[in-house]
Amino acid sequence: MEIEKNYRINSLFAFYQPLLTAKQNNYMQLYYGDDYSLGEIAEEFNVSRQAVYDNLRRTEKILEDYEEKLHLYQEFTARNRQADEIQAYVATTYPHDSRLNRLVAGLENLEEQ
């Protein structure tokens, strides 16, 4: 369960990171991206572990609120599932249609940018 939560928070952070403050960005990057402990972050910023913990929880809530309103992550995952399904269908049904396969690959590349 913790792994899924971390994956979700990291994904939301990737989408909504520009909307966060510098402090929120720093704490999130260190904790989720660089695997710092609360104590290490607290020491780095000369604050208490509780302050770091509280900031991280508030930021997680903010990220979830953004997602609830904007649905960027949800729509991204839905598009990826659809693209995977299309790619599998084309590969199975039209394996020799090079133009169609290039078009599907082009769509996939757009999502990765």
Curated annotation (Swiss-Prot):
Functional note: Might take part in the signal recognition particle (SRP) pathway. This is inferred from the conservation of its genetic proximity to ftsY/ffh. May be a regulatory protein.
UniProt xrefs under SUPFAM superfamilies: Sigma3 and sigma4 domains of RNA polymerase sigma factors (SSF88659)
Entry similarity comment: Belongs to the UPF0122 family.
Protein name per its UniProtKB record: UPF0122 protein LVIS_0949
Organism in which the protein naturally occurs: Levilactobacillus brevis (strain ATCC 367 / BCRC 12310 / CIP 105137 / JCM 1170 / LMG 11437 / NCIMB 947 / NCTC 947) (Lactobacillus brevis)
HAMAP family linked: UPF0122
Domain of life of the native organism: Bacteria
